[in-house]
Swiss-Prot record:
Its main location: membrane. Residues 59-68, 129-148 are extracellular. This is Protein cuti-1. It comes from the Eukaryota. Residues 1-37, 90-107, 170-202 are cytoplasmic. It is found in: Cell membrane; Cytoplasm. It is a multi-pass membrane protein. Keywords: Cell membrane, Cytoplasm, Membrane, Transmembrane, Transmembrane helix. The keyword Lipid metabolism does not apply. The lineage of its organism: Eukaryota, Metazoa, Ecdysozoa, Nematoda, Chromadorea. It comes from Caenorhabditis elegans. Interacts with vps-39. The chain crosses the membrane at residues 38-58, 69-89, 108-128, 149-169. GO terms for cellular component: cytoplasm; plasma membrane.
Length: 202
């Protein structure tokens, strides 16, 4: 049977919370995971807020979609803000478990957007009549066609894929920040590891 135990660290090992290992590859290694997490959460909120504004215009101004869609999007935006606030508090307190709600929220958003994109593509493949039947639940398809052209389901798919890509990028960064906090807590408890703090800005 192979030995599954992790090899002990060398006696002269020096841990640094500012090691290049903790600079996010998703930012071309230009930012520490903690800094990148704040920025990615802010970008996520901007995207969600922009979506809420667009849904408000479409539901309350042009009346092309149901008003309930705007309220759902507004609720998602509020959840984004709340989970980001909890994440920021967790980073401040150096508690990686408090980042869990943000990661779960992002996973839900990714799944929802990918499903929405697939539905849009399938509707385009089956023709305009099928598209009108499916999307008629959400709004006035004829009005949407007048405002956004005949290939509007393609636009929905593109926006969904683009937003999902941003969410995946955000999740990678925040997961890296959580791993960083777990590492920091682990090495802080090791008696044979020198925890080297730096005054360098994260």
């Amino acid at each position: 049977m192979p030995n599954d135990r992790v090899a002990p660290l060398p006696p002269n090992f020096v841990y640094s919370p500012h090691d290049k290992f903790y600079y996010a590859p998703a930012t071309c290694n230009s930012m520490h995971y903690t800094t990148a997490s704040y920025i990615s959460a802010f970008i996520e909120f901007l995207v969600m807020g922009t979506g809420a504004i667009c849904f408000y215009v479409m539901s309350h101004k042009s009346d092309s979609i149901g008003k309930w869609l705007f309220y759902i999007q507004a609720g998602i935006t509020v959840l984004s803000l709340l989970t980001s606030a909890l994440m920021a508090f967790g980073l401040w307190k150096e508690n990686p478990q408090m980042l869990g709600s943000k990661l779960k929220f992002i996973e839900f958003i990714i799944c929802f957007l990918l499903i929405w994109a697939v539905i849009s593509i399938v509707c385009m493949a089956f023709g305009i009549q099928f598209t009108r039947q499916v999307f008629g639940i959400f709004g006035k398809v004829h009005r949407i066609e007048q405002d956004y052209g005949p290939i509007w389901p393609f636009n929905i798919a593109v926006v969904s894929f683009f937003t999902a890509a941003i969410a995946i990028w955000t999740r990678i960064i925040i997961q890296g920040a959580a791993d960083y906090l777990y590492d920091k807590a682990y090495f802080a408890d090791k008696q044979n590891v020198e925890l080297r703090e730096s005054s360098k800005t994260r």
